[in-house]
């Protein structure tokens, strides 16, 4: 079964930077050669990239955790470790990316081959060549690689189509799509046959073409989530022209106008801007009995509606006999020629911000936090402090002393004293425990 998946949650973990190296030159004719430890390589980033061949988020159903590789460690003779390759994740055109931690939309992937960095790889740690000084010409200090970014994301697919087919269930949307595009949607004589959007390309004899999407039937309350409404109303947002199909074969001559108004109400309740889209009213099933009389009643009901600023254009067709179908496609193409393309820059412009995966904003970042465990151990945390800790090579005493100086400079020692920490109290940073000494 070709299941349509249009919303999924994933984890992305960028690679850690490679560790810097502590090394010294050992050459026959170079006495006191000095430090020669190289830097670590950059960790791999996680990048989402538009793949026009994809139509759903189905590939993410069983693969939701993505990890990039770590950078290579620095080497002797001042050689830098290799940087890791970025991990490229293919997504369908029309994918919106939301950060689940902040709730913000961080990217909208609508262009061909568009890329979005969603987790930046850590930079490589510096080797000991960077820490040489007049006072310490042979430092045994090197940095560990910076941790890569971790993010929890929600991907939401809004199908990109030039034309959207809307209407109540079983008005003939799937039949029309199959006739004009060659697509093979599931078609049957009962409601809700279409449970997923179907997409096809219309190719006209004059060389023009456009993408057409068959949206599952809407019902009353769709804008409030009844039926499949909310799930598929989002796909209509990006269509440029709407073909509103109305079934003319009912025994009730006034059913057509009631359903026409109901669909427009659901569109308005979901997003009033949708009613501003160019809309062609398509009277379907004109080959069946009662259809001609019902069409006349439908036109009369519209003419009597004083709330309409403009009478909609009505185009009768029969998808089964192909009556009027080619002319409808020509009319649709003409309307598309006059309708601007979907503007991803302006759509939700106040909500969408291109995510640049930059370093954290130092103004908003808490330098450190101090808490106390039930066993009496003091616990240091905070994004900046933890990042410094992870980049400290604790296997070398000089690196430990440098980290202690960094903590003192950040004000951690004074803050611990203010909290009442005494000599000999245990202090923990992640799994590393040490004694506090005044």
From Swiss-Prot:
One of its GO terms (molecular function) is GTP binding. Signal peptide: none annotated. It comes from the Bacteria. GO terms for cellular component: cytoplasm. Residues 161-337 form the OBG-type G domain. Its EC number is 3.6.5.-. Keywords: Cytoplasm, GTP-binding, Hydrolase, Magnesium, Metal-binding, Nucleotide-binding. Its cofactor is Mg(2+). Residues 2-160 form the Obg domain. HAMAP family: GTPase_Obg. Belongs to the TRAFAC class OBG-HflX-like GTPase superfamily. OBG GTPase family. This is GTPase Obg. It comes from Limosilactobacillus reuteri (strain DSM 20016) (Lactobacillus reuteri).
């Amino acid at each position: 079964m070709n299941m349509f998946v249009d919303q999924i949650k994933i984890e992305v973990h960028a690679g850690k930077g490679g560790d810097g190296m502590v090394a010294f030159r050992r050459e026959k004719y170079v006495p006191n050669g000095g430090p020669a430890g190289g830097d670590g390589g950059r960790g791999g980033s996680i990048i989402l990239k538009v793949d026009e061949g994809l139509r759903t988020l189905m590939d993410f159903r069983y693969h939701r955790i993505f990890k990039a590789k770590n950078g290579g460690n620095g080497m002797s003779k001042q050689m830098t470790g290799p940087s890791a390759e970025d991990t490229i994740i293919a997504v369908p055109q029309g994918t919106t990316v939301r950060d689940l931690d902040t709730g913000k939309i961080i990217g909208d992937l609508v262009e061909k081959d568009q890329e979005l960095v969603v987790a930046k790889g850590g930079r490589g740690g510096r080797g000991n060549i960077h820490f040489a000084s007049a006072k310490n010409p042979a430092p045994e200090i090197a940095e560990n690689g910076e941790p890569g970014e971790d993010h929890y994301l929600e991907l939401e697919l809004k199908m990109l189509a030039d034309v959207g087919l809307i209407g109540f269930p079983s008005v003939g949307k799937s039949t029309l799509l199959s006739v004009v595009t060659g697509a093979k949607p599931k078609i049957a004589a009962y409601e809700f046959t279409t449970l997923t959007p179907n997409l096809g390309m219309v190719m006209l004899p004059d060389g023009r073409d456009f993408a057409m999407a068959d949206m599952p039937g809407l019902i009353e309350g769709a804008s409030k989530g009844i039926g499949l409404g909310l799930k598929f109303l989002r796909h209509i947002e990006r269509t440029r022209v709407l073909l509103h199909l109305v079934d003319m074969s009912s025994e009730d001559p006034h059913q057509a106008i009631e359903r026409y108004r109901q669909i427009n109400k659901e569109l308005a309740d979901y997003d009033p801007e949708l009613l501003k889209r160019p809309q062609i009213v398509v009277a379907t099933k004109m080959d069946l009995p009662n259809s001609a009389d019902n069409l006349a009643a439908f036109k009369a009901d519209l003419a009597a509606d004083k709330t309409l600023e403009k009478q909609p254009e009505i185009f009768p067709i029969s998808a089964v006999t192909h009556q009027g179908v080619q002319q409808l496609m020509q009319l649709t193409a003409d309307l598309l020629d006059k309708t601007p393309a979907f503007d991803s820059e302006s759509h939700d412009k106040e909500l969408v911000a291109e995510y640049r995966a930059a370093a954290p904003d130092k103004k908003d970042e808490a330098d450190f936090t101090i808490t106390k465990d039930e066993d009496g151990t003091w616990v240091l945390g905070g994004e900046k402090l933890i990042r410094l800790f992870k980049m400290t090579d604790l296997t070398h005493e000089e690196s430990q002393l440098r980290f202690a100086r960094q903590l003192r400079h950040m004000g951690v020692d004074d803050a611990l004293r203010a909290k009442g920490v005494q000599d000999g109290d245990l202090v923990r940073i992640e799994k590393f425990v040490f004694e506090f000494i005044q």
